[in-house]
């Protein structure tokens, strides 16, 4: 595999700003590893962060890389982020899904249109855009051509980037970590249904 992805899957009706918070925490973990991350909207309710891998990386190694990053985020920010697969156990937390890297799993590709009520497009972002604040509804089939003309193919650097150092993540995961806390979030009603992001 040439890249891996971390899928941020929020419960229904959670403000998208909270998804952006988790994306920033993923970026922090990647920065510790000197690994580049490329965010994009899913075109629906979630966000994907892609990380280039060395050419020929086995699926198992890519999956382990994402599992370590996702677990670090969930451990440091347990009030908002989780790697819990059970929807009932997640509550109002955002699922940091690394299992989409299992062979045969699929994600909406960059620039793909989605069948939803706002005609969303899965759109690559810069980190500056993410930091400034965006929503999935900002990127639709109606304004996609205009955006491409303005910013070009933001996904091109992913295809050219040097792959992440897989040895670095193994060392990082073994080192002692300081657990953080997330302020201002509370678990409320349990999400009752699953949805594709």
Language-model features: locations:
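Active-site palm subdomain of RNA-directed nucleic acid polymerases
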Residues: 27-41
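Short, conserved phosphate-binding/catalytic loop or strand-edge motifs used
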Residues: 41-51
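C-terminal accessory nucleic-acid interaction domains of nucleic acid-metabolism proteins
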Residues: 1-5, 9-16, 25, 32-33, ...
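Nucleic-acid 5′ end/cap handling module spanning
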Residues: 17, 40, 53-55
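Catalytic palm subdomain of template-directed nucleic-acid polymerases
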Residues: 50-62
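Active-site glycine- and acidic-residue-rich loops that bind
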Residues: 20
